Swiss-Prot record:
The keyword Chaperone does not apply. This is Stationary phase protein 3. The keyword Disulfide bond does not apply. Glycans are attached at N86. It is found in: Membrane. It comes from Saccharomyces cerevisiae (strain ATCC 204508 / S288c). GO terms for cellular component: endoplasmic reticulum; membrane.
Length: 127
């Protein structure tokens, strides 16, 4: 989110657009975040209640730890920003690359649990 504010501000200063255009971008960001929070709570409810047993195979963290919740946000937040940037066409090149980089780090980091199968998790816990 901070990156988005910086990119919008830099584009505002660089392109010398009107102040109205700047606030429209910021307002659209807050509107998007409101929708994102609503959708995230809805998805999170079903994620925990309905798919907890299946999805817990893909994370190292216990379900009651803060890292478990942060790992879920780490996937949804950059992905939603990437979709938002591509659908609206705002700052497409800069923010989309940033968001894709976050998603790539999330999915490929060796210390992160999302690329680990249930069998490997069980073997790691056993050791």
């Amino acid at each position: 989110m901070i990156c988005y504010f910086l990119v919008v501000t830099i584009n505002f200063l660089k392109e010398k657009t009107t102040i109205c255009h700047y606030f429209v971008n910021i307002f659209s960001l807050f509107l998007f975040l409101f929708v994102f929070v609503f959708v995230f709570i809805f998805v999170y409810f079903f994620y925990v209640i309905l798919f907890y047993r299946f999805c817990s195979l893909f994370t190292y963290f216990p379900a009651n730890s803060i890292w478990y919740y942060l790992s879920i946000i780490n996937i949804f937040f950059p992905l939603c920003f990437f979709l938002y940037e591509n659908f609206t066409g705002r700052n497409r090149r800069k923010c989309s690359l940033f968001c894709l980089t976050l998603i790539k780090i999330t999915y490929t980091s060796p210390n992160h649990g999302f690329m680990v199968t249930g069998k490997e998790k069980f073997e790691k816990l056993r050791d």
